[in-house]
């Protein structure tokens, strides 16, 4: 129990603190879910408090720069979600996720189906990669958590939907596995995901998970 910020700090501390992941002078990329232009109370996106706390922890660990981005589905999602304001107050930098020029064609030799894609260069270039989605119901994939959040790092998400979505989600993790996974299940969306209709779609759980293992954290979620 506690606030999101308190739970993020406690969860990261159990893994050795942010200094176990971030060294002084390193660049960090944080990938929340900011797909939708909806206010925080609707639970469609990662809560701004969760993202901002991760930015603060990275800065305190000595990160040179902390970049935050998503490949949004709605225009204005950075602002409408409250994430942009929170990140900038915490000392982070919002990076454009909606411009194809920011994505680099990358091969994926371990993949079964999703063998090549354009991946956001912020993910490819960062010293440390953190993923931090909310736990939600999803009409297409049943649930969305850390592995599904990887979809927002590639340009052509449509190709994933057309070609065995579940396998493509698993394949996409191989482009680059996150160093730290934080799953915000404080107020998960249990129906009508991934966007939701109203706050009745949310259930208070006051839970937050953190792990180095993206498969383990999704299984626990």
Predicted regions, residues:
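N-terminal and secondary-structure boundary signal
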Residues: 1-220
């Amino acid at each position: 129990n506690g606030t999101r910020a308190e739970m993020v700090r406690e969860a990261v501390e159990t893994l050795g603190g942010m200094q176990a992941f971030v060294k002084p002078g390193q660049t960090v990329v944080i990938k929340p879910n900011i797909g939708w232009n909806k206010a925080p109370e609707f639970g469609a996106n990662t809560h701004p408090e969760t993202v901002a706390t991760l930015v603060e922890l990275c800065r305190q660990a000595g990160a040179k720069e902390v970049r935050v981005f998503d490949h949004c589905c709605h225009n204005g999602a950075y602002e409408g979600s409250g994430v942009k304001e929170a990140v900038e107050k915490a000392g982070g930098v919002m990076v454009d996720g909606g411009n194809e020029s920011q994505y680099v064609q990358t091969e994926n030799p371990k993949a079964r189906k999703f063998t090549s894609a354009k991946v956001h260069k912020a993910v490819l270039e960062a010293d440390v990669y953190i993923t931090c989605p909310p736990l939600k119901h999803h009409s297409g994939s049943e649930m969305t958590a850390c592995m599904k959040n990887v979809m927002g790092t590639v340009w052509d998400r449509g190709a994933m939907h057309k070609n065995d979505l579940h396998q493509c989600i698993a394949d996409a993790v191989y482009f680059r596995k996150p160093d730290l996974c934080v799953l915000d299940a404080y107020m998960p969306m249990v129906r009508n995901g991934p966007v939701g209709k109203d706050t009745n779609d949310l259930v208070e759980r006051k839970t937050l998970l953190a792990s180095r293992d993206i498969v383990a954290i999704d299984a626990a979620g």
